[in-house]
Amino acid sequence: MTLNEKKSINECDLKGKKVLIRVDFNVPVKNGKITNDYRIRSALPTLKKVLTEGGSCVLMSHLGRPKGIPMAQAGKIRSTGGVPGFQQKATLKPVAKALSELLLRPVTFAPDCLNAADVVSKMSPGDVVLLENVRFYKEEGSKKAKDREAMAKILASYGDVYISDAFGTAHRDSATMTGIPKILGNGAAGYLMEKEISYFAKVLGNPPRPLVAIVGGAKVSDKIQLLDNMLQRIDYLLIGGAMAYTFLKAQGYSIGKSKCEESKLEFARSLLKKAEDRKVQVILPIDHVCHTEFKAVDSPLITEDQNIPEGHMALDIGPKTIEKYVQTIGKCKSAIWNGPMGVFEMVPYSKGTFAIAKAMGRGTHEHGLMSIIGGGDSASAAELSGEAKRMSHVSTGGGASLELLEGKTLPGVTVLDEKSAVVSYASAGTGTLSNRWSSL
């Protein structure tokens, strides 16, 4: 199976159908207010397609990592008329309100996802129901297939067609991602899922060359499989974040008290040798922004070269490194970014990460760079920098995108029906998809 062989929502008969849509509304909520609605807005093209075609939407999502209860204890939810008090932070109720405002139509909130048959039975074409957080029940993510199936059977009874638009959880084998489509015998990708699949199919297939991977984050161990897999596909590799110091130490540089995974030094040496053999140019930081403690200060130390003084820890890439990385991105026609360059949450150490975001945004806007942000912290940084809207694609799935880049298959994609006619990588590009996303 290649990524882009999956059935599209465009192939589904939606008229008069109750359409079960697995969305990813796992958004940040503070004091009952949504602080970033990007994931909700990302689902709008799919929802509008169903509603325009004369269907109704039954939406399923999770929010956070609540401590779920077994289905056998469902009375705990039903006796209170909704979510127990200790779970209030994970309720999807604020999302229903936000979605209603975005869709300009009522959204009915069902306070118990497994006790919504009555609400769903009264739906008419054009109606939208949002079920409460599916993770309030343990069976959603149970390791036991029979438990997942038991929950999926109830949810599957609410609809006629299953659409998956939750790329962010596509790496999960769960009741709502894999259980329901197995029961209904039909499953198609929504527009967000299609867009995600399209871009990753291109970067993992035949991307415009040269292709640069910018990889950062805290641990080499978190990115071993990604680095191994991508080394077969890229022309340049830029390494930043705390993981860079393991590579620098492996080359004999002083790293002060910067983070280092001693157990991964040999892997770092091996990867650098492998890159050399494959003629992949690996570029490591040539200067650093440092301090003696892990805290923000007005005037952090900027090193002259790769070496970090004793008693100091590097917290961002330095200005010379920024210049070199930006120049490298400027040479390329495709770029994939996974992981920040420094502790970008602290202003003194955000310049490296934001410079990468700006270089990718500018390259996309001015020179047609195909730029893909692999979700997670990189997506947050792209948003904070103001560059997200200029990127070709900002993934909604940190974990899912990481697993794809590692060369793994995603259960939530594999389970979907096959396309009636397989399209090529070239035709899986932005095309008409970009038009659906221009207003987001």
UniProtKB/Swiss-Prot annotation:
Pfam families documented for this protein: PGK
Binding site for (2R)-3-phosphoglycerate: V23, D24, F25, N26, R39, S61, H62, G64, R65, R135, H171, R172, K219
A GO cellular-component term linked to this record: glycosome
Annotated binding of ATP, by residue: A218, A242, A314, D377, S378
Essential cofactor(s): Mg(2+)
Enzyme category, top tier: transferase
Pathway: Carbohydrate degradation; glycolysis; pyruvate from D-glyceraldehyde 3-phosphate: step 2/5
EC number(s) reported in the record: 2.7.2.3
GO MF term set: ADP binding; ATP binding; metal ion binding; phosphoglycerate kinase activity
Binding site for AMP: A218, K219, K223, A242, A314, E345
Keywords carried by this UniProt record: ATP-binding, Glycolysis, Glycosome, Kinase, Magnesium, Metal-binding, Nucleotide-binding, Peroxisome, Transferase
Signal peptide: none
Compartment annotation: Glycosome
SUPFAM superfamilies in UniProt: Phosphoglycerate kinase (SSF53748)
Family: Belongs to the phosphoglycerate kinase family.
PANTHER family: PHOSPHOGLYCERATE KINASE, PHOSPHOGLYCERATE KINASE 1, CHLOROPLASTIC-RELATED
Assembly: Monomer.
Name the record gives this protein: Phosphoglycerate kinase, glycosomal
